[in-house]
Amino acid sequence: MNSHTKQKIGVFGLGKTGISVYEELQGKCDVIVYDDLKANRDIFEELYTNNSIAALSDSRWQNLDKIVLSPGIPLTHKIAGIAKNFNIPIISDIDLLFEKSKNLNFIAVTGTNGKSTTTALISHILNSNGLDYPVAGNIGVPALQAKASKDGYILELSSFQLDLVKTFTAKIAVLLNITPDHLDRHQDMTGYIAAKSKIFDRMDKDSYAAINIDNYYCREIFMLLQQEQRIKLIPFSVTKILKNGISVVGDKINDNDISYKLPFNKNLQGTHNCENIAASYAVAKIIGVESKKILESISSFQSLPHRMQYIGSINNIGFYNDSKATNAISAVQSIKALDNIYWLAGGIPKEGGIEEIKPYFSKIKKAYFYGQAKEIFAKTAKNIVDFVICDNLEQAFDLAYKDAVGDNAEVKNILLAPSCSSYDQFKNFEERGELFMKLSKRHCEEITK
């Protein structure tokens, strides 16, 4: 990385991102590192025997050319104060990847919900059609660990990551939706929207932005960019057919004034996935993939784990894992896509609880609440939908399964859409989803014995 050769650089945060940054920079410049968590420092010392760890009291932090901050570190942290006091620029791993690959196309995807599925769907479409676009970023692959590419990268970017970027410039940017989230980090919606809007920074007339104009906050950003006239804009909608833009309404995808039949894919059910499809189609068309080829790729897409993941169906009971639905807005999307639902929800509740889901309670046959949120959710559901309070996810699943087996309805669905973060009982949403999948498969095996 020539632009950083012989510079003094600090890496703060030693999770996956921080480690990837250190591995990129070591031997090319003078690097010091730190993490507030002793466990992360210990892991680093096991991996690397050199003396790179320096506490923030070390004066070397005051004499750096740059500090690379991991996205989990808020800008209110002491390290940000040191950077400000000593005029040290804070950058991100996203900037580092961009600076060494400026000749390639960068596709950036953000939004409160749907980022990972859209990122994966774009990648599937492009790579199925002979192009080379690895994914990286918030999807679980640190930017600097993305495999080498000849065409470009598709980056899923969270508001935390966008807060840190300084030089990164997207060729194509996607804004899926904005709803209240991470307000503890951004203070209020104004701060959150400002962070999301940074995806369009430094883009010019040769760049493209695909924006969901059904969403109020996204529409406001779209209109502001229209006034600026510095980016080529492609609006998309799932509620109305646009004469100039991309629409997914019913079983049709409309590309300006041309309509195509949308292939059914059980892994892409629900309004939220219509948004993901519209955005992915727009990006693929910009890149130059033919409409017919895009539709073929959509039909063969396999959903990501824990994101409205269809696990299987037996005796008319379908099992759906939407563990990634960590807020009510996200859970609404999976609930809207199904009927006769045995709903598993709980964990650490987000602001507003499940109020957003109340209009869709008629789709829920019975709810099973667990974790810290169980009493709060029960209060919202009282006298509207039948529910049971459970100790944990496993108990909730067992009760839901028993009730579904006894239901004579033609179609029944057991849905994990927690509407909460997972940290009261699990390490993360992935561990929560893995347990649900294990339980689903175990019960399917019992039925078939």
UniProtKB/Swiss-Prot annotation:
Which terms are listed as keywords in the entry?
Answer: ATP-binding, Cell cycle, Cell division, Cell shape, Cell wall biogenesis/degradation, Cytoplasm, Ligase, Nucleotide-binding, Peptidoglycan synthesis
Where, by residue number, does ATP bind? 111-117
Among InterPro entries, the record links this protein to: Folylpolyglutamate_synth_CS, Mur-like_cat_sf, Mur_ligase_C, Mur_ligase_C_dom_sf, Mur_ligase_cen, MurD
Family in the record: Belongs to the MurCDEF family.
- Report the main location listed first in the record: cytoplasm
Which superkingdom?
Bacteria
Might you give the EC number(s) for this enzyme? Answer: 6.3.2.9
- Where does the UniProt annotation locate this protein? Cytoplasm
GO MF annotations in UniProt? ATP binding; tetrahydrofolylpolyglutamate synthase activity; UDP-N-acetylmuramoylalanine-D-glutamate ligase activity
NCBIfam families annotated for this entry? murD
- Catalytic reaction equation(s): UDP-N-acetyl-alpha-D-muramoyl-L-alanine + D-glutamate + ATP = UDP-N-acetyl-alpha-D-muramoyl-L-alanyl-D-glutamate + ADP + phosphate + H(+)
Q: What pathway is this protein said to act in by its record?
A: Cell wall biogenesis; peptidoglycan biosynthesis
In Swiss-Prot or TrEMBL terms, this protein is called: UDP-N-acetylmuramoylalanine--D-glutamate ligase
Offer a single GO CC term for the protein: cytoplasm
BP GO terms, sorted: cell division; cell wall organization; peptidoglycan biosynthetic process; regulation of cell shape
SUPFAM superfamilies referenced in this protein's UniProt entry, alphabetically: MurCD N-terminal domain (SSF51984), MurD-like peptide ligases, catalytic domain (SSF53623), MurD-like peptide ligases, peptide-binding domain (SSF53244)
